[in-house]
Amino acid sequence: MIDRYTGKEMGHIFSLENKYAIWQEIEVLACEAQAELGTIGITREEAAWIRAHANFNRAEVDEIEAVTNHDVIAFLTNMGSYIDAEVPHGSAKPSRWVHYGMTSTDLGDTALCYQLTQACDILIRRVQSCAKICKRRAFEERNTLCVGRTHGIHAEPMTFGMKFGSWAWELKRDLDRLRDARKNVAYGAISGAVGTYSSIDPFVEEYVCEKLGLAHDPLSTQVISRDHHAYLAGVLATVAATCERIATEMRALQKTDTLEAEEPFRKGQKGSSAMPHKRNPITAEKICGLSRVVKANAQVAFDNVALWHERDISHSSAERVAQADSFIALDHMLTKLEFLLEGMVLYPEQMKANLNKTRGMLFSSKVLLALVNTGITREEAYKVVQSNAMRVWSDIQQGMDGPTFRERLEADPACTLTKEQLDTIFDPWSFLTRSKVLFERLERLDLD
Protein backbone atom coordinates (compact mmCIF):
# COMPACT_ATOMS: atom_id res chain seq x y z
CA MET A 1 0.00 0.00 0.00
CA ILE A 2 1.23 3.52 -0.75
CA ASP A 3 2.49 5.60 2.16
CA ARG A 4 -0.40 8.07 1.75
CA TYR A 5 -2.85 5.62 3.31
CA THR A 6 -0.53 3.64 5.59
CA GLY A 7 -1.02 4.25 9.30
CA LYS A 8 2.00 3.78 11.53
CA GLU A 9 0.54 1.00 13.67
CA MET A 10 -0.96 -1.06 10.84
CA GLY A 11 2.02 -0.40 8.60
CA HIS A 12 4.33 -1.85 11.24
CA ILE A 13 2.31 -5.06 11.45
CA PHE A 14 2.83 -5.72 7.74
CA SER A 15 6.45 -4.59 7.73
CA LEU A 16 9.30 -7.00 7.06
CA GLU A 17 10.71 -6.16 10.48
CA ASN A 18 7.56 -7.41 12.21
CA LYS A 19 7.31 -10.49 10.00
CA TYR A 20 10.93 -11.42 10.68
CA ALA A 21 10.45 -10.81 14.41
CA ILE A 22 7.52 -13.24 14.41
CA TRP A 23 9.54 -15.74 12.37
CA GLN A 24 12.33 -15.51 14.92
CA GLU A 25 9.94 -16.07 17.83
CA ILE A 26 8.38 -19.11 16.15
CA GLU A 27 11.78 -20.67 15.48
CA VAL A 28 12.92 -20.04 19.06
CA LEU A 29 9.69 -21.46 20.48
CA ALA A 30 10.07 -24.54 18.28
CA CYS A 31 13.59 -25.08 19.67
CA GLU A 32 12.29 -24.70 23.23
CA ALA A 33 9.53 -27.20 22.49
CA GLN A 34 12.05 -29.69 21.08
CA ALA A 35 14.23 -29.29 24.19
CA GLU A 36 11.25 -29.88 26.45
CA LEU A 37 10.22 -32.89 24.39
CA GLY A 38 13.75 -34.30 24.57
CA THR A 39 13.66 -36.58 21.55
CA ILE A 40 16.12 -35.04 19.06
CA GLY A 41 19.15 -34.10 21.15
CA ILE A 42 18.74 -30.37 21.72
CA THR A 43 19.34 -29.49 25.36
CA ARG A 44 17.55 -26.90 27.46
CA GLU A 45 20.85 -25.04 27.66
CA GLU A 46 21.09 -24.89 23.88
CA ALA A 47 17.49 -23.70 23.65
CA ALA A 48 18.27 -21.00 26.21
CA TRP A 49 21.34 -19.98 24.18
CA ILE A 50 19.22 -19.73 21.05
CA ARG A 51 16.68 -17.58 22.91
CA ALA A 52 19.41 -15.25 24.19
CA HIS A 53 21.34 -14.86 20.94
CA ALA A 54 18.70 -15.09 18.21
CA ASN A 55 18.61 -11.98 16.05
CA PHE A 56 18.41 -10.83 12.43
CA ASN A 57 19.32 -7.89 10.25
CA ARG A 58 16.93 -7.01 7.46
CA ALA A 59 19.61 -5.62 5.14
CA GLU A 60 21.69 -8.76 5.58
CA VAL A 61 18.65 -10.95 4.91
CA ASP A 62 18.05 -9.02 1.69
CA GLU A 63 21.65 -9.60 0.58
CA ILE A 64 21.41 -13.33 1.22
CA GLU A 65 18.02 -13.58 -0.51
CA ALA A 66 19.50 -11.93 -3.60
CA VAL A 67 21.62 -15.08 -3.90
CA THR A 68 19.29 -17.80 -2.57
CA ASN A 69 16.08 -16.44 -4.12
CA HIS A 70 14.33 -17.91 -1.05
CA ASP A 71 13.24 -15.58 1.73
CA VAL A 72 12.94 -18.20 4.49
CA ILE A 73 16.36 -19.72 3.81
CA ALA A 74 17.86 -16.23 3.72
CA PHE A 75 16.30 -15.40 7.06
CA LEU A 76 17.36 -18.67 8.69
CA THR A 77 20.92 -18.22 7.44
CA ASN A 78 21.07 -14.74 8.89
CA MET A 79 19.45 -15.74 12.18
CA GLY A 80 21.83 -18.68 12.50
CA SER A 81 24.85 -16.44 12.09
CA TYR A 82 23.81 -14.40 15.13
CA ILE A 83 23.07 -17.50 17.21
CA ASP A 84 26.50 -18.98 16.49
CA ALA A 85 28.55 -15.77 16.55
CA GLU A 86 29.73 -16.18 20.15
CA VAL A 87 29.96 -19.97 20.25
CA PRO A 88 33.49 -21.07 21.24
CA HIS A 89 35.60 -22.35 18.37
CA GLY A 90 35.23 -26.06 17.91
CA SER A 91 31.93 -26.31 19.80
CA ALA A 92 28.75 -27.59 18.19
CA LYS A 93 26.66 -24.86 16.60
CA PRO A 94 23.28 -24.39 18.36
CA SER A 95 21.79 -23.03 15.13
CA ARG A 96 21.67 -26.58 13.77
CA TRP A 97 18.46 -27.08 15.77
CA VAL A 98 16.69 -24.10 14.23
CA HIS A 99 13.91 -25.12 11.80
CA TYR A 100 14.48 -28.79 12.67
CA GLY A 101 11.83 -30.96 10.98
CA MET A 102 9.98 -27.90 9.70
CA THR A 103 9.15 -26.68 6.22
CA SER A 104 9.06 -23.05 5.12
CA THR A 105 5.30 -22.88 5.21
CA ASP A 106 5.20 -24.04 8.83
CA LEU A 107 6.99 -20.82 9.59
CA GLY A 108 5.33 -18.55 7.04
CA ASP A 109 1.73 -19.61 7.53
CA THR A 110 1.85 -19.58 11.31
CA ALA A 111 3.48 -16.16 11.27
CA LEU A 112 0.97 -14.82 8.75
CA CYS A 113 -2.00 -15.91 10.83
CA TYR A 114 -0.42 -14.30 13.88
CA GLN A 115 0.05 -11.07 11.89
CA LEU A 116 -3.58 -11.18 10.82
CA THR A 117 -4.73 -11.45 14.43
CA GLN A 118 -2.60 -8.41 15.26
CA ALA A 119 -4.18 -6.52 12.38
CA CYS A 120 -7.68 -7.61 13.37
CA ASP A 121 -7.14 -6.24 16.87
CA ILE A 122 -6.53 -2.77 15.43
CA LEU A 123 -9.62 -2.89 13.23
CA ILE A 124 -11.77 -4.18 16.08
CA ARG A 125 -10.71 -1.22 18.17
CA ARG A 126 -11.47 1.23 15.36
CA VAL A 127 -14.89 -0.24 14.53
CA GLN A 128 -15.76 -0.19 18.22
CA SER A 129 -14.85 3.49 18.45
CA CYS A 130 -16.94 4.40 15.39
CA ALA A 131 -19.92 2.45 16.74
CA LYS A 132 -19.74 4.23 20.09
CA ILE A 133 -19.67 7.62 18.40
CA CYS A 134 -22.75 6.67 16.36
CA LYS A 135 -24.62 5.50 19.44
CA ARG A 136 -23.82 8.69 21.34
CA ARG A 137 -24.76 10.96 18.45
CA ALA A 138 -27.96 9.00 17.86
CA PHE A 139 -29.22 10.10 21.27
CA GLU A 140 -27.93 13.63 20.76
CA GLU A 141 -29.94 13.93 17.53
CA ARG A 142 -32.96 11.79 18.43
CA ASN A 143 -35.24 14.85 18.13
CA THR A 144 -33.59 16.42 15.08
CA LEU A 145 -36.32 16.18 12.45
CA CYS A 146 -35.32 15.42 8.88
CA VAL A 147 -36.85 13.87 5.81
CA GLY A 148 -36.45 10.18 5.13
CA ARG A 149 -35.77 9.31 1.50
CA THR A 150 -36.39 6.17 -0.53
CA HIS A 151 -35.13 5.89 -4.10
CA GLY A 152 -33.69 9.38 -3.53
CA ILE A 153 -37.23 10.79 -3.22
CA HIS A 154 -38.72 12.33 -0.08
CA ALA A 155 -40.72 9.65 1.76
CA GLU A 156 -41.69 10.40 5.39
CA PRO A 157 -40.30 12.38 8.33
CA MET A 158 -37.75 10.75 10.62
CA THR A 159 -34.97 12.00 12.88
CA PHE A 160 -31.27 12.25 12.20
CA GLY A 161 -30.67 10.26 15.35
CA MET A 162 -32.19 7.27 13.58
CA LYS A 163 -29.49 7.49 10.91
CA PHE A 164 -26.76 7.40 13.54
CA GLY A 165 -28.59 4.58 15.30
CA SER A 166 -28.79 2.49 12.14
CA TRP A 167 -25.05 2.94 11.61
CA ALA A 168 -24.35 1.96 15.23
CA TRP A 169 -26.20 -1.34 14.79
CA GLU A 170 -24.45 -2.10 11.51
CA LEU A 171 -21.05 -1.36 13.02
CA LYS A 172 -21.94 -3.61 15.96
CA ARG A 173 -22.59 -6.44 13.53
CA ASP A 174 -19.25 -5.67 11.87
CA LEU A 175 -17.61 -5.79 15.29
CA ASP A 176 -19.07 -9.24 15.92
CA ARG A 177 -18.04 -10.44 12.47
CA LEU A 178 -14.49 -9.16 12.91
CA ARG A 179 -14.12 -10.89 16.26
CA ASP A 180 -15.40 -14.12 14.75
CA ALA A 181 -13.09 -13.79 11.74
CA ARG A 182 -10.12 -13.16 14.03
CA LYS A 183 -10.89 -16.36 15.90
CA ASN A 184 -11.31 -18.21 12.61
CA VAL A 185 -7.90 -17.15 11.30
CA ALA A 186 -6.00 -17.58 14.60
CA TYR A 187 -4.43 -20.91 13.62
CA GLY A 188 -0.93 -22.23 13.32
CA ALA A 189 0.53 -25.32 11.68
CA ILE A 190 3.94 -26.94 12.16
CA SER A 191 3.32 -30.28 10.54
CA GLY A 192 5.99 -30.73 7.89
CA ALA A 193 6.07 -31.03 4.13
CA VAL A 194 2.54 -32.35 3.54
CA GLY A 195 1.06 -32.13 7.02
CA THR A 196 1.97 -35.65 8.24
CA TYR A 197 4.44 -34.66 11.00
CA SER A 198 6.92 -36.91 9.22
CA SER A 199 9.95 -35.22 10.81
CA ILE A 200 8.49 -33.34 13.76
CA ASP A 201 6.39 -34.24 16.77
CA PRO A 202 2.89 -32.67 16.97
CA PHE A 203 3.86 -31.44 20.44
CA VAL A 204 6.03 -28.77 18.83
CA GLU A 205 3.05 -27.40 16.92
CA GLU A 206 0.86 -27.44 20.02
CA TYR A 207 3.54 -25.76 22.14
CA VAL A 208 4.30 -22.98 19.65
CA CYS A 209 0.65 -22.25 18.92
CA GLU A 210 -0.26 -22.10 22.60
CA LYS A 211 2.56 -19.64 23.29
CA LEU A 212 1.37 -17.45 20.40
CA GLY A 213 -2.28 -17.61 21.42
CA LEU A 214 -3.22 -19.58 18.31
CA ALA A 215 -5.16 -22.79 17.87
CA HIS A 216 -3.28 -25.57 16.08
CA ASP A 217 -4.77 -26.62 12.76
CA PRO A 218 -6.39 -30.05 13.31
CA LEU A 219 -5.40 -31.22 9.83
CA SER A 220 -3.32 -29.02 7.59
CA THR A 221 -1.70 -29.93 4.31
CA GLN A 222 1.55 -28.08 3.74
CA VAL A 223 -0.51 -24.95 4.27
CA ILE A 224 -3.30 -23.78 6.50
CA SER A 225 -6.36 -23.98 4.26
CA ARG A 226 -7.17 -20.64 2.68
CA ASP A 227 -10.86 -20.75 3.55
CA HIS A 228 -9.78 -19.16 6.84
CA HIS A 229 -8.24 -16.24 4.99
CA ALA A 230 -11.11 -15.95 2.51
CA TYR A 231 -13.64 -15.70 5.32
CA LEU A 232 -11.61 -12.91 6.88
CA ALA A 233 -11.30 -11.09 3.55
CA GLY A 234 -15.07 -11.31 3.12
CA VAL A 235 -15.58 -9.76 6.53
CA LEU A 236 -13.12 -6.97 5.70
CA ALA A 237 -15.12 -6.30 2.53
CA THR A 238 -18.33 -6.15 4.56
CA VAL A 239 -16.81 -3.65 7.00
CA ALA A 240 -15.59 -1.61 4.04
CA ALA A 241 -19.11 -1.67 2.60
CA THR A 242 -20.49 -0.35 5.89
CA CYS A 243 -17.97 2.49 5.82
CA GLU A 244 -18.95 3.18 2.22
CA ARG A 245 -22.65 3.22 3.08
CA ILE A 246 -22.11 5.85 5.77
CA ALA A 247 -19.77 7.87 3.57
CA THR A 248 -22.20 7.72 0.64
CA GLU A 249 -24.96 9.10 2.84
CA MET A 250 -22.61 11.85 3.98
CA ARG A 251 -21.84 12.77 0.37
CA ALA A 252 -25.51 12.83 -0.57
CA LEU A 253 -26.45 15.01 2.40
CA GLN A 254 -23.64 17.48 1.67
CA LYS A 255 -24.80 18.19 -1.88
CA THR A 256 -25.57 21.87 -2.38
CA ASP A 257 -29.18 21.04 -3.21
CA THR A 258 -29.58 19.14 0.08
CA LEU A 259 -26.98 20.51 2.54
CA GLU A 260 -28.33 18.86 5.68
CA ALA A 261 -24.91 17.74 6.88
CA GLU A 262 -21.30 18.51 6.13
CA GLU A 263 -18.01 16.83 6.93
CA PRO A 264 -15.49 18.90 8.92
CA PHE A 265 -13.77 21.63 6.94
CA ARG A 266 -10.59 22.75 8.68
CA LYS A 267 -9.23 26.28 8.78
CA GLY A 268 -6.93 26.77 5.82
CA GLN A 269 -8.39 23.82 3.90
CA LYS A 270 -8.93 24.34 0.17
CA GLY A 271 -11.74 22.78 -1.83
CA SER A 272 -10.72 23.41 -5.43
CA SER A 273 -7.75 24.87 -7.26
CA ALA A 274 -10.11 26.65 -9.68
CA MET A 275 -13.23 27.36 -7.58
CA PRO A 276 -12.41 28.90 -4.19
CA HIS A 277 -15.99 28.57 -2.94
CA LYS A 278 -15.97 24.76 -2.97
CA ARG A 279 -16.34 22.67 0.22
CA ASN A 280 -16.08 19.14 -1.12
CA PRO A 281 -16.80 15.90 0.81
CA ILE A 282 -13.29 14.60 0.13
CA THR A 283 -13.05 12.41 3.24
CA ALA A 284 -16.27 10.58 2.41
CA GLU A 285 -15.23 10.25 -1.23
CA LYS A 286 -11.88 8.77 -0.19
CA ILE A 287 -13.66 6.19 1.98
CA CYS A 288 -15.87 5.19 -0.96
CA GLY A 289 -12.87 4.84 -3.25
CA LEU A 290 -10.81 2.69 -0.87
CA SER A 291 -13.84 0.49 -0.25
CA ARG A 292 -13.57 -0.65 -3.86
CA VAL A 293 -10.01 -1.84 -3.19
CA VAL A 294 -10.97 -3.87 -0.13
CA LYS A 295 -14.00 -5.42 -1.82
CA ALA A 296 -12.00 -6.31 -4.93
CA ASN A 297 -9.26 -7.89 -2.82
CA ALA A 298 -11.82 -10.22 -1.27
CA GLN A 299 -12.12 -11.89 -4.67
CA VAL A 300 -8.37 -12.52 -4.60
CA ALA A 301 -8.74 -14.31 -1.26
CA PHE A 302 -11.52 -16.52 -2.59
CA ASP A 303 -9.44 -17.36 -5.66
CA ASN A 304 -6.60 -18.42 -3.34
CA VAL A 305 -8.67 -21.18 -1.72
CA ALA A 306 -8.28 -23.65 -4.59
CA LEU A 307 -4.62 -24.71 -4.54
CA TRP A 308 -3.08 -27.72 -6.27
CA HIS A 309 -2.97 -30.89 -4.20
CA GLU A 310 -1.31 -30.26 -0.81
CA ARG A 311 0.00 -26.84 -1.80
CA ASP A 312 1.23 -24.64 -4.59
CA ILE A 313 2.59 -21.13 -4.36
CA SER A 314 0.06 -19.29 -6.53
CA HIS A 315 -1.60 -17.82 -3.44
CA SER A 316 1.58 -16.36 -1.99
CA SER A 317 2.28 -13.49 -4.37
CA ALA A 318 -1.37 -12.44 -4.37
CA GLU A 319 -1.56 -12.52 -0.57
CA ARG A 320 1.55 -10.42 -0.13
CA VAL A 321 -0.24 -7.61 -1.95
CA ALA A 322 -3.93 -8.09 -1.21
CA GLN A 323 -3.89 -8.87 2.50
CA ALA A 324 -1.67 -5.99 3.56
CA ASP A 325 -3.44 -3.58 1.20
CA SER A 326 -6.88 -4.54 2.50
CA PHE A 327 -5.97 -4.12 6.15
CA ILE A 328 -4.06 -0.89 5.59
CA ALA A 329 -6.82 0.58 3.41
CA LEU A 330 -9.56 -0.39 5.85
CA ASP A 331 -7.56 0.95 8.78
CA HIS A 332 -7.29 4.29 6.97
CA MET A 333 -10.99 4.21 6.10
CA LEU A 334 -12.01 3.61 9.70
CA THR A 335 -9.67 6.31 10.96
CA LYS A 336 -11.24 8.78 8.55
CA LEU A 337 -14.74 7.52 9.32
CA GLU A 338 -14.16 8.19 13.01
CA PHE A 339 -13.08 11.74 12.13
CA LEU A 340 -16.14 12.18 9.92
CA LEU A 341 -18.64 10.83 12.45
CA GLU A 342 -17.24 12.82 15.35
CA GLY A 343 -16.97 16.06 13.43
CA MET A 344 -20.05 15.84 11.20
CA VAL A 345 -21.80 19.22 11.18
CA LEU A 346 -25.60 19.14 10.99
CA TYR A 347 -27.93 21.87 9.73
CA PRO A 348 -31.36 21.38 11.37
CA GLU A 349 -32.86 24.49 9.75
CA GLN A 350 -31.94 23.18 6.32
CA MET A 351 -33.48 19.83 7.28
CA LYS A 352 -36.67 21.67 8.19
CA ALA A 353 -36.62 23.53 4.88
CA ASN A 354 -36.22 20.25 3.02
CA LEU A 355 -39.13 18.75 4.97
CA ASN A 356 -41.31 21.52 3.57
CA LYS A 357 -39.89 21.35 0.06
CA THR A 358 -42.59 18.96 -1.18
CA ARG A 359 -45.36 21.16 0.28
CA GLY A 360 -46.83 18.56 2.60
CA MET A 361 -46.82 15.53 0.32
CA LEU A 362 -44.80 13.67 2.97
CA PHE A 363 -48.07 13.18 4.83
CA SER A 364 -49.79 11.27 2.00
CA SER A 365 -49.65 7.90 3.77
CA LYS A 366 -51.33 9.33 6.87
CA VAL A 367 -54.06 10.92 4.72
CA LEU A 368 -54.57 7.61 2.91
CA LEU A 369 -55.13 5.69 6.15
CA ALA A 370 -57.37 8.41 7.61
CA LEU A 371 -59.60 8.29 4.52
CA VAL A 372 -59.82 4.50 4.73
CA ASN A 373 -60.96 4.92 8.33
CA THR A 374 -63.90 7.05 7.10
CA GLY A 375 -65.32 3.99 5.38
CA ILE A 376 -64.24 4.34 1.74
CA THR A 377 -62.16 1.67 0.02
CA ARG A 378 -58.39 1.85 -0.12
CA GLU A 379 -58.58 2.25 -3.91
CA GLU A 380 -60.92 5.23 -3.60
CA ALA A 381 -58.75 6.80 -0.91
CA TYR A 382 -55.59 6.24 -2.94
CA LYS A 383 -57.17 7.99 -5.94
CA VAL A 384 -58.08 11.06 -3.86
CA VAL A 385 -54.61 11.31 -2.33
CA GLN A 386 -52.65 10.66 -5.51
CA SER A 387 -54.65 13.03 -7.71
CA ASN A 388 -54.01 15.93 -5.33
CA ALA A 389 -50.37 14.97 -4.81
CA MET A 390 -49.75 14.87 -8.56
CA ARG A 391 -51.06 18.42 -8.90
CA VAL A 392 -48.59 19.56 -6.25
CA TRP A 393 -45.79 17.70 -8.04
CA SER A 394 -46.73 19.46 -11.26
CA ASP A 395 -46.56 22.87 -9.59
CA ILE A 396 -43.12 22.08 -8.15
CA GLN A 397 -41.82 20.79 -11.47
CA GLN A 398 -42.94 23.97 -13.22
CA GLY A 399 -41.56 26.25 -10.51
CA MET A 400 -45.05 27.48 -9.56
CA ASP A 401 -46.12 28.62 -6.07
CA GLY A 402 -49.40 26.69 -6.20
CA PRO A 403 -51.46 25.39 -3.27
CA THR A 404 -49.91 23.01 -0.76
CA PHE A 405 -50.97 19.39 -0.53
CA ARG A 406 -53.16 20.16 2.47
CA GLU A 407 -54.77 23.14 0.76
CA ARG A 408 -55.64 21.01 -2.25
CA LEU A 409 -57.17 18.33 0.00
CA GLU A 410 -59.24 20.95 1.82
CA ALA A 411 -60.56 22.17 -1.54
CA ASP A 412 -61.39 18.66 -2.78
CA PRO A 413 -64.99 17.55 -1.96
CA ALA A 414 -63.84 13.93 -2.17
CA CYS A 415 -61.67 14.47 0.91
CA THR A 416 -64.05 14.36 3.88
CA LEU A 417 -61.45 14.82 6.62
CA THR A 418 -62.10 17.59 9.16
CA LYS A 419 -59.72 20.43 10.03
CA GLU A 420 -58.95 18.76 13.36
CA GLN A 421 -58.13 15.49 11.61
CA LEU A 422 -55.87 17.28 9.14
CA ASP A 423 -54.13 19.16 11.97
CA THR A 424 -53.26 15.83 13.56
CA ILE A 425 -52.18 14.30 10.27
CA PHE A 426 -49.98 17.20 9.17
CA ASP A 427 -47.81 17.05 12.28
CA PRO A 428 -44.41 15.49 11.45
CA TRP A 429 -44.15 14.06 14.95
CA SER A 430 -47.22 11.93 14.26
CA PHE A 431 -44.90 9.63 12.32
CA LEU A 432 -42.62 9.18 15.30
CA THR A 433 -44.96 8.31 18.14
CA ARG A 434 -43.61 4.75 18.20
CA SER A 435 -39.97 5.55 17.44
CA LYS A 436 -39.25 5.59 21.17
CA VAL A 437 -38.82 1.83 21.00
CA LEU A 438 -35.92 2.27 18.56
CA PHE A 439 -33.95 4.24 21.12
CA GLU A 440 -34.90 1.87 23.92
CA ARG A 441 -33.33 -0.91 21.86
CA LEU A 442 -30.32 1.24 21.06
CA GLU A 443 -29.82 2.00 24.75
CA ARG A 444 -29.31 -1.73 25.33
CA LEU A 445 -26.75 -2.05 22.53
CA ASP A 446 -23.52 -3.37 24.08
CA LEU A 447 -20.44 -2.17 22.22
CA ASP A 448 -17.79 -3.51 24.60
Predicted stretch roles:
Residues F139-G161, E260-P264, G268-S272, H277-K278, ...:
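Glycine-rich cofactor-pocket loops
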